[in-house]
C-alpha cells in the first residue's frame, strides 16, 4: 500500500481506533486518505502494488478484506434462500393451508369471485411495483446524490471507497447495492411471513363459498342440526382457486404495499435535504397513499376482509421500520459516526488552537486592590463553573488545578462600618448563613452579664479541666461573622440579600503583634457606627470541613446538644440572637483545641460585648479586614500621622507576661453606657490593668486595614465563633473569661478603654 508520506502519517496497514482516525486525517492533508479496517492487512498488501495513477486523486479509499466474503458467503445465501422459499410457497402446492370450518350458507363468505385478470392490482403487478418501484427510486436518488457530493471540494460528505480484492467500489455502488439489497430481502421476508400466517390460520376469503361450492347433501346431518361444518365438502373444480380462498389473513397485497411504501418514505426523509420544503412530503405521501390504495382494493373486490387488510398494514410497516433503522442505519452515511468519534479524540494541540475550547487562564496576581478583592469573592463561582467546561469524554486533556482549594472560602467580616459596594453577591452552596438583629439596651446587657457571672462561677472548674486537655487533631478553622447596620434579615442556604464583597476572610495567626514567646495574643476592640443596629452573621458548619479528632468530636457533640436544648427557651425570652449564642458558650464551655506549640499565642473571643447607646454620636473608626494578600502588597496598612498620646493611632500592645491569655474583643458597643458589674475571675485583673493603661488615649477618624492570609480549616460547630491555629494566634471563645472595663470618672476615658488612637498616615508591614 502506498503511504501518504507527505503528511507524516504512519504506514501501518492494520490500525484500529484513534490511530486509524489520525492516519486518515494526516493523509487527507496530502491529497489522499488511506482508510484501514480491522483485519484489513491482507487487502492492504494486495493493494500495495497499485500505482498512484490507479487511485483517484482527492478520493477517500478504504481497504477491506471482509466486504466480498460477507457478500458472497453470508448475504447472498440468505437472500437466495428467501427467494427459493417464496417460490415454493407461492407458485407450488407443496404447502397447503389448513382446513378451517365455516357455517352453512354464510353470507360473509358468499361474495362474488373476481377473476385475476379483472383485479385492479394483480399479484404480478404488485410484485413489480413493490420490487421495482422503490429499487429504481433508490438508485436514481443515489445517483443524483453522488453527483452532487462529488462536485464538492475534497468530496465532503461521501462515504469512502472500498478497495476489496483488487476492485474499487465507490460510494454510489456500495450504497445502492446495500439499500436495494435490504429492500429486496425485506420484501421476501414480508411475503414469507404472510404466507406462513396464511397457511397456519386457513381463514376463508369472502368469495370462498362461491368457488368452493359445498355439497351439503353429503353430510350425515343437515345444516339445521349442525350449522358449523369442519369437513371438506367442496365440489369446485379449480383447486388452486379454492386453496387461495383459504389464505385470506393477512392480506398479502397489504403487507407488501405497506413495506414498500414505508421503506421508500424513510429513504426520502433521510437523504433529501430541506432546500425544497414540499418535495419531500410530496414523495412520502405519494408512496404512502399508493400502499393504502393497494390494500383497500382488496376489500372492495371481495378478496380480503377489512381486518385482514389492516393487520397486513401493521405487519408490513413494522418490518420496514425495523430494517430501515437497524439494517441500513436510517440510510445515513457510515462516515458520520467516524467524524463524531474523531472530534472526541482530538489532540491537545487541536484543542488549544480551537478558540471555542480554549480554557481561560486565571491571573492570580493583581495590582489593583478592588479587583483583587472581587477576585477573592468570586473565586468559588469561577471554580465551580470551570469544572463543567472540562467534561469531555475520551479526550486526553491535562487539567491544571488551581492554586488554592476550591469551595473552602471561609471568611470573617466586620462590616459594621464598611461602605456598601454594588458588586454581585456570590452564593455559596455549602454554607448556610444567618443575620440576627442584636438589641441595644444597656440595662438588658447589664442583667445578662450578671446572670452569666453566676453561671460562670459554677463551671469554672470544668473549664479549667478542659484547658488542660491535650491538643485536638483538627486543623485551624475559619469563622464567618457579619455585623451590619442593615435591618434584621435571616437567610438560609445562602439566600441572604447582602453584597458579596462584605465577606472577607481572617486568620488570627497572621494578626500583627502576636508574639509566640508570650502566652497571649493581641487585644482588639472594634467600635460600631453610631446609631446603627447590629447584625451578626454566623455561618453553620460546612460539610467538607469536619474534624475527625475524637476530642473535638465530643466537644462538637456537646455544643450541638446544648444548642438544641436552649433554642426554644432563648426564643421565648426574646433575647438577641448574639446574646443567645454567647450565653450557650458560657453555659456549655469552650470548644477546646490547643495549639501544637506550647508557647503559641491565644486570642479569645469573649462574651463581654457591651452596647453603644443610640445617642452617642462620637466619631468612629473603620476597621477593614481583608483576606488573601498578594506578595507585592503590604499585609497591614494603618494610616496614622504621629506617635504619642492623643494621636489616634492603632497599636498592637503586647501583654504582660503574668497574663495567661488576652482577649480579642469584638464590637465593644456600649462604652458610654452606665457602669456594669465587673466579673471577678482569675483573668479579670490582668486585663483590667491593661485596659487602664490605654484609657488616656483618644480615638480619631481613621481607617485601619488588616490583611491576613487564611489557611484551610475545618469547622467543628454550626454557630461557633472560635478558631484555632497550630503555630499562630487562635481566636477562641472562653466561657469563664469575661472582660469588662472599669468605670472611669470621665466619659472620654471610658470610651477609649481597649483603644489606641489612630492617625491617617502611618502604615505597618508584616
From Swiss-Prot:
* Pfam families in the record: PAP2 (PF01569)
Location(s), subcellular = Postsynaptic density membrane
Q: How is it modified after translation?
A: O-glycosylated. Probably at Ser-347.
The record's account of tissue expression is: Brain-specific, it is exclusively expressed in neurons (at protein level).
Record's InterPro entries? P_Acid_Pase_2/haloperoxi_sf (IPR036938), P_Acid_Pase_2/haloperoxidase (IPR000326), PA_PP_rel (IPR043216)
Which keywords appear in this protein's UniProt record, sorted alphabetically?
Cell membrane, Glycoprotein, Membrane, Phosphoprotein, Postsynaptic cell membrane, Synapse, Transmembrane, Transmembrane helix
Q: What happens when the gene is disrupted?
A: Knockout mice lacking Plppr4 are viable but show a severe alteration of synaptic transmission leading to juvenile epileptic seizures. Excitatory transmission in CA1 pyramidal neurons is significantly increased. It is associated with transiently reduced weight during development, a reduction in brain size and higher mortality 3 to 4 weeks after birth. Heterozygous knockout mice, show loss of somatosensory filter function and altered resilience during stress-related behaviors.
Q: Report the outcome of residue 300 to S.
A: Loss of function in regulation of glutamatergic synaptic transmission
The record's section on Gene3D superfamilies has: Phosphatidic acid phosphatase type 2/haloperoxidase (1.20.144.10)
Q: Which residues carry this modification: Phosphoserine?
A: 37, 347, 386, 439, 462, 474, 608
Q: What does this protein do?
A: Postsynaptic density membrane protein that indirectly regulates glutamatergic synaptic transmission through lysophosphatidic acid (LPA)-mediated signaling pathways. Binds lysophosphatidic acid (LPA) and mediates its internalization into cells. Could act as receptor or a transporter of this lipid at the post-synaptic membrane. Modulates lysophosphatidic acid (LPA) activity in neuron axonal outgrowth during development by attenuating phospholipid-induced axon collapse.
Q: Which PANTHER family match?
A: LIPID PHOSPHATE PHOSPHATASE, PHOSPHOLIPID PHOSPHATASE-RELATED PROTEIN TYPE 4
Stated name of the protein: Phospholipid phosphatase-related protein type 4
Amino acid at each position: 500500500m502506498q503511504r501518504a508520506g507527505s503528511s507524516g502519517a504512519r504506514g501501518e496497514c492494520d490500525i484500529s481506533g484513534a490511530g486509524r482516525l489520525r492516519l486518515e486525517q494526516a493523509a487527507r492533508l496530502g491529497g489522499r486518505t488511506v482508510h484501514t479496517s480491522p483485519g484489513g492487512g491482507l487487502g492492504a498488501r494486495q493493494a500495495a502494488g497499485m500505482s498512484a495513477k490507479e487511485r483517484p486523486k482527492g478520493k477517500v479509499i478504504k481497504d477491506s478484506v471482509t466486504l466480498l466474503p460477507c457478500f458472497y458467503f453470508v448475504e447472498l445465501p440468505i437472500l437466495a434462500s428467501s427467494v427459493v422459499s417464496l417460490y415454493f410457497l407461492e407458485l407450488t402446492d407443496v404447502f397447503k393451508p389448513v382446513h378451517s370450518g365455516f357455517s352453512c350458507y354464510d353470507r360473509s363468505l358468499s361474495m362474488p369471485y373476481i377473476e385475476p385478470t379483472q383485479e385492479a392490482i394483480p399479484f404480478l403487478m404488485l410484485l413489480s411495483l413493490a420490487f421495482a418501484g422503490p429499487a429504481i427510486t433508490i438508485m436514481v436518488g443515489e445517483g443524483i446524490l453522488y453527483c452532487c457530493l462529488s462536485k464538492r471540494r475534497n468530496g465532503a460528505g461521501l462515504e469512502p471507497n472500498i478497495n476489496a480484492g483488487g476492485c474499487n467500489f465507490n460510494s454510489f455502488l456500495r450504497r445502492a447495492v446495500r439499500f436495494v439489497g435490504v429492500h429486496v430481502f425485506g420484501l421476501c421476508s414480508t411475503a414469507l411471513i404472510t404466507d406462513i400466517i396464511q397457511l397456519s390460520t386457513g381463514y376463508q376469503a369472502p368469495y370462498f363459498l362461491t368457488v368452493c361450492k359445498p355439497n351439503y347433501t353429503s353430510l350425515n346431518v343437515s345444516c339445521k342440526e349442525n350449522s358449523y361444518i369442519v369437513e371438506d365438502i367442496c365440489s369446485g373444480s379449480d383447486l388452486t382457486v379454492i386453496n387461495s380462498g383459504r389464505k385470506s389473513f393477512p392480506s398479502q397485497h397489504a403487507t407488501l404495499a405497506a413495506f414498500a411504501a414505508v421503506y421508500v418514505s424513510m429513504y426520502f426523509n433521510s437523504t433529501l435535504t430541506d432546500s425544497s420544503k414540499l418535495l419531500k412530503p410530496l414523495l412520502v405521501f405519494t408512496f404512502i397513499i399508493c400502499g393504502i390504495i393497494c390494500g383497500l382494493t382488496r376489500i372492495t373486490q371481495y378478496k380480503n376482509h377489512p381486518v385482514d387488510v389492516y393487520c397486513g398494514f401493521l405487519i408490513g410497516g413494522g418490518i420496514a421500520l425495523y430494517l430501515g433503522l437497524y439494517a441500513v442505519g436510517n440510510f445515513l452515511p457510515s462516515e458520520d459516526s467516524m467524524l463524531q468519534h474523531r472530534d472526541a479524540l482530538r489532540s491537545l494541540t487541536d484543542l488549544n488552537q480551537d478558540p471555542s475550547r480554549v480554557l481561560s487562564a486565571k491571573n492570580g496576581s493583581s495590582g489593583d486592590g478592588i479587583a483583587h478583592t472581587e477576585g477573592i469573592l468570586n473565586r468559588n463561582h469561577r471554580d465551580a463553573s470551570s469544572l463543567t467546561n472540562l467534561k469531555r469524554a475520551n479526550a486526553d486533556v491535562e487539567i491544571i488545578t488551581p492554586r488554592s482549594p476550591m469551595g473552602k472560602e471561609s471568611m470573617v467580616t466586620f462590616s459594621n462600618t464598611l461602605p456598601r459596594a454594588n458588586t454581585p453577591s456570590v452564593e455559596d452552596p455549602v454554607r448556610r448563613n444567618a443575620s440576627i438583629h442584636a438589641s441595644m439596651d444597656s440595662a438588658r446587657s447589664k442583667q445578662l452579664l450578671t446572670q452569666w457571672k453566676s453561671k460562670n462561677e459554677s463551671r469554672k472548674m470544668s473549664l479549667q479541666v478542659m484547658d488542660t486537655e491535650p491538643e485536638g487533631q483538627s486543623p485551624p478553622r475559619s469563622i464567618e461573622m457579619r455585623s451590619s447596620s442593615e435591618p434584621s434579615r435571616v437567610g438560609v442556604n445562602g439566600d441572604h440579600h447582602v453584597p458579596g464583597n462584605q465577606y472577607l476572610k481572617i486568620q488570627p495567626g497572621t494578626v500583627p503583634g502576636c508574639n509566640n514567646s508570650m502566652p497571649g495574643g493581641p487585644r482588639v476592640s472594634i467600635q460600631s457606627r453610631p446609631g446603627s443596629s447590629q447584625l451578626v452573621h454566623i455561618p453553620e458548619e460546612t460539610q467538607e470541613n469536619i474534624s475527625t479528632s475524637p476530642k473535638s468530636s465530643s466537644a462538637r457533640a456537646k455544643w450541638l446538644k446544648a444548642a438544641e436544648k436552649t433554642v426554644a427557651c432563648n426564643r421565648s425570652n426574646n433575647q438577641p440572637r448574639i446574646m443567645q449564642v454567647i450565653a450557650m458558650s458560657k453555659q456549655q464551655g469552650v470548644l477546646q483545641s490547643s495549639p501544637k506549640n506550647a508557647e503559641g499565642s491565644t486570642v479569645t473571643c469573649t462574651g463581654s460585648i457591651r452596647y453603644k447607646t443610640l445617642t452617642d454620636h462620637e466619631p468612629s473608626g473603620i476597621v477593614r479586614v481583608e483576606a488573601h494578600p498578594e506578595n507585592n502588597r503590604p499585609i497591614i496598612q494603618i494610616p496614622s500621622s504621629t506617635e504619642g498620646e492623643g494621636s489616634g493611632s492603632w497599636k498592637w500592645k503586647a501583654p504582660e507576661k503574668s497574663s495567661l491569655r488576652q482577649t480579642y474583643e469584638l464590637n465593644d458597643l456600649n462604652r458610654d453606657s452606665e457602669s456594669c458589674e465587673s466579673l471577678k475571675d482569675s483573668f479579670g485583673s490582668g486585663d483590667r490593668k491593661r485596659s487602664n493603661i490605654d484609657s488616656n488615649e483618644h480615638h480619631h477618624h481613621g481607617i485601619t486595614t488588616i490583611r491576613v492570609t487564611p489557611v484551610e480549616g475545618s469547622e467543628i460547630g454550626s454557630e461557633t465563633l472560635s478558631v484555632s491555629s497550630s503555630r499562630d494566634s487562635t481566636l477562641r471563645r472562653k466561657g469563664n473569661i469575661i472582660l469588662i472595663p472599669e468605670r472611669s470618672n470621665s466619659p472620654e476615658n471610658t470610651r477609649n478603654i481597649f483603644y489606641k488612637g489612630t492617625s491617617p498616615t502611618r502604615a505597618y508591614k508584616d
